[in-house]
Amino acid sequence: MLFASNAIILKIKQRNSNSYIYTLYTYEEGLKEVIIFTNQKILCSNLKLYRIYFVLFKKGAPWDQIQRLYPLFFYPKIEQNPLKMIVLEYLSELIIYQLYSPENCTFIYFIFHYTLFQLNICSNNMILPIFISSLYSLLKFLGWEPELSNCVYTGESLNSENSNLTDSKIGFSASYGGIVKLNVLPKQEYIGFFNKDELFIFTNDN
């Protein structure tokens, strides 16, 4: 299968002057932490796989104990966009610290891969809907769903005729776990905004 040996970078941490620890999400094994040596490009160049494949080693293993070659996805347009990078980092942290079980790793992998693909080609005004859709799917996997019908701060309902939520933009707060009326939280708590029609389309798609 095409995805069977793919890996997605979730996090990179410098180990020493010669190597980095890469936290990856793989199709077959879920989370995988490996050491990548900076001079591995010599080996990869010889294999004509430079910039396409990463050579994975067990921690502390010598050079002759290569585990596997993983095709690794690159998303240059995400790396060039600070807002897209925030989304990538947020979802990565969620996967690393909450979705660590190897069970159903293919399900999580497909959600994350699809999200990265969409972020790489989308315009700025589509970043939030893509993020919310992916977050919604991942949180459902954990058994919790964001609140998308009522303001989690005031309790106002989108379906109420008397609510001004129906006539204005609706904020979304990841830390509060759902939609929030504008101007009731500090500005930094809002990661984006919907109007009612956009939110209706999103909730019906999921």
From Swiss-Prot:
InterPro entries listed in its UniProt record: ARFGAP/RecO (IPR037278), RecO (IPR003717), RecO_C (IPR042242)
Name of the molecule in the record: Uncharacterized 24.3 kDa protein in hemA-psbN intergenic region
An annotated GO BP: DNA recombination
Gene3D superfamilies on file: Recombination protein O, C-terminal domain
Signal peptide: none
GO cellular component, one term: cyanelle
Source domain of life: Eukaryota
Keyword Plastid part of the UniProt annotation: yes
UniProt keyword list: Cyanelle, Plastid
Cell compartments where the protein resides: Plastid, Cyanelle
Species per Swiss-Prot/TrEMBL record: Cyanophora paradoxa
